């Protein structure tokens, strides 16, 4: 009887571990369609150049869409936005056709992306952009052609994202996203 109880407990622990691993996997990104509207701008995303973003929030049925990667990052910093974020995806510009056609299904998890900040190219609403890449070589090539520096998601300065958006507040000594300076 004791062996049976031990075996049942072992099976339950094993199955429970599988469920935890499955639950920890983020939901996949959603392909961008003609119908998606930017969360902050209220405009159709396909009408704007540059990288886009989507955040999958546990308490919402549909992804929250953004006309720029910068706005996507801003959502994660703002205190009044939902915090039950399951996944953050941004356009992988290394796989984009062009700046004007960033793609509809070339997403990368934002927390794994590299971002070029301070480049000469502007995002979907004409503001400074945090240009995402999955590949360091692609990010370096972009930075050499358009200016800027490469940072991780956690290193994107709060004032770069939440400032005026014109590059005048991007201070390298400013606290970074994901740090407690």
Identify the role of each PLM range.
Residues 42:
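Cys/His-coordinated zinc-binding microdomains
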